[in-house]
Amino acid sequence: MTKFVKIAAVAAALLGTAPAFAATSVTGAAPSATARIIRPLTLTATGSLNFGTIVMNNVTANRTVTVNPDGSITCAVELVCDTTGSFVTYNVTGTNGQTVNIIKNTSTLTGSNSGSLTLTPVGANSVVLTNSGAPGKDFPIGGSIDIAPTTIDGVYTGTVDVQVDYN
Amino acid sequence: MTGRRIALLSFGALLAGALGMSGPAPAQCRLCATPSTQTITSADSDNMRIEIEARLDFDQLVVRDNSPGSVQLQPDGSSTISGSVGAISGRAMVGTAMVHGEPGRFVRVDMPTAITLHGIRGGTIRLDSLVTDLQSAPRLDSEGMLQFRFGGALHIESNADGDFRGDIPITVDYL
């Protein structure tokens, strides 16, 4: 009888043991970590923006002359312009594959006989770098000016204001 | 004699059944000192999940030259730069994750100490010192949620530039 009771106690102990469940664990979708490493931009220019000679022929309203980024000149009526001018070639260096915005700001050309003209650079709005550092990427910049009936003749000079920045 | 044999056989059957049990077998506990009628299920992992609300994004880093540099982004959003790293973008963001599970449960959150970010155009950079803003004993709140942020330190070797990306696996366990 005693033996029977002991066996029962062992059986009860075995059945009564709480099952050991594995600790629950979940792993979420891996969040990504990202970084964009870029090198400082450098901008250099060669050449100059030259509209050539513009003859005012009884100008009655504001007329625009444009040196296109390929050097050709678009001449408005009442003006006589050269066929071609010269444009500025810029070179920008930075990080391969990055898009660089080209910021074109107006500037003032000062006349030799007083007077001034507003110069607006003309060209692409951005370029994509195809290498890091040298050789960089070239891009041309032309410009446009408005000739008014009151524009004073003379030689106008100034600087072209172009900046670059990563997109 | 017959009655005694039947009793022994009965217990033998019970013992065989107990020894033959494999794996967690949900069952009512009938012979416990304090019997419980509550069914123990394996649904704990079914109601816990992690949502990644924001990735760890160092955004744009400007490096001045080819010497090594590093930038550290803390879970509170503060950052420090050193070496060739000249600036970190103001749009850099720490990572944010949300754990959903049983209200009031204590959890353990595991992340690797370091990972490798791979460049789209080749190359690698190291991200280490991964750290969270969790308390020492994180616990799901009364709504079963726990949000935490994480950051780390990015190490940039010479000539590394471009876009880099890597994955940070996060594991959460109930305690």
Each language-model region and where it sits:
Chain A
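Bacterial N-terminal signal peptides that target proteins for export
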Residues: 1-9
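N-terminal signal peptide c-region/cleavage motif recognized by signal peptidases
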Residues: 17-18
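A short local loop/turn or secondary-structure capping micro-motif enriched for an aromatic residue
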Residues: 52-53, 109-112
